[in-house]
């Protein structure tokens, strides 16, 4: 049923998003806005209203962009429509942020008044400024005894370079000062531009697949208007679909009669093809196909690749469908079919980082009820062959023979780290251990901004966790890929009883190979159950074995019946047993348990 949506003049609309580092109170501030503008009754309120995914609520992080439309009455008596688009704060989801910002005219930069500016907020803030948004800094958690507003204001001006002397202060938890934030927001952020009588032009910010409704698209109307019953044209596919419903989230799904220029809402047109309304595409009406296509979003390149395999091989098709449904909602996910001798059929998937990989795997297991196993994650390497061809390697099995390769290059990431001075030494040590090269260092008040170039393979695995633990959680990180650089890389194979197990192979730097080979072999020794014969576990680079360990055989005590007796009799029995074990070893195969594959992921540096 369509609810009567208030018609608001375009100059009274404000589209904004909130930029903040993890834990600086972004979702809590959003909750306060929703409560103060009457989006939900008090009994329906819950913490993190916009984080609808169970995973988001559990981990306390925002993964997906969400939108909500609120109505706010300003002290000057005018009513404003606020369209708030939520953005994630974690470094792995920065592409989601740029998508959300494309739909806004302004952004609130929320900074924790106790912790100060963090690297991720700086990166997202620059993205907003590049896209021409008006940025309004806000100091949150002002009620904490350790809050230092003057120092933080100085940091915002020093590090980010935006005016913050009269930044509003608030406490999203208690609601103190939030009214003032809403007032400033309306005054500072510009109204959207757009002609409501022009032909329809709308940008798809996000899409997701609903089993009953088909594709649901979150759109920002740039020009014109769209109603239920209109025939809409998706520019990239050229397909025309009748619009079955339009509406807004407030924050519940509520249908309306019309969406007009300047507004943000959802459009459902019964599209059953998963790729029927790609994110970043332009929608118009079938009567005006000549409307210009809006600039979309740049494709993000996956940084980490891993094989995902269903434990039950009959799940292969449901797994493919689940990945396709996830991909429409998560444009950074990449996948292609892959088969492994050890793990069967599955997909080689590309992710933005380890958190992204964990989240995708958990979403597949929870939302689609699949049991999955993953192979060791790896970054993309570049190889120059002796014939002069350049090939990209996203899996150890694709690594060409060393004799055919002229040069191997690994991806280098530029890491910007913000850290309080007292933890600088620990952070520098960590970066150097990870083969980092220092490029820049600036002292900004109590904080230090350091820039290192570190191989991507070192950054994406567990660098973020280690950085947090060596700085008691105060250091923050933002990284981006800069180039490929020649490096001494080797492929370490794992052999069990002389047979290579493809799913356990890994690519690493030559100086780490021996240490990681030994660690892996020792770990495997504990995980492979004892057999009736000796099992040799080896790590090798090419034909050279760098580590070995043996799982000893279980054996019967054949001397038990001898009591005293002649020593030659005992020797004969032992020799007979040995012969039997030897024969067994030739025909016996070793069942490798699932934990052994996960051991590769957990080999400490």
UniProtKB/Swiss-Prot annotation:
Coiled coil: none annotated. It is a peripheral membrane protein. Keywords: Cell inner membrane, Cell membrane, GTP-binding, Hydrolase, Membrane, Nucleotide-binding, Protein biosynthesis. Required for accurate and efficient protein synthesis under certain stress conditions. May act as a fidelity factor of the translation reaction, by catalyzing a one-codon backward translocation of tRNAs on improperly translocated ribosomes. Back-translocation proceeds from a post-translocation (POST) complex to a pre-translocation (PRE) complex, thus giving elongation factor G a second chance to translocate the tRNAs correctly. Binds to ribosomes in a GTP-dependent manner. The keyword DNA repair does not apply. Pfam families: EFG_C, GTP_EFTU, GTP_EFTU_D2, LepA_C. SUPFAM superfamilies: EF-G C-terminal domain-like, P-loop containing nucleoside triphosphate hydrolases. GO terms for cellular component: plasma membrane. This is Elongation factor 4. Belongs to the TRAFAC class translation factor GTPase superfamily. Classic translation factor GTPase family. LepA subfamily. PANTHER family: TRANSLATION FACTOR GUF1 HOMOLOG, CHLOROPLASTIC, TRANSLATION FACTOR GUF1-RELATED. PROSITE patterns: G_TR_1, G_TR_2. One of its GO terms (molecular function) is translation elongation factor activity. GTP binds at residues 23-28, 140-143. It is found in: Cell inner membrane. The keyword Ligase does not apply. Residues 11-193 form the tr-type G domain.
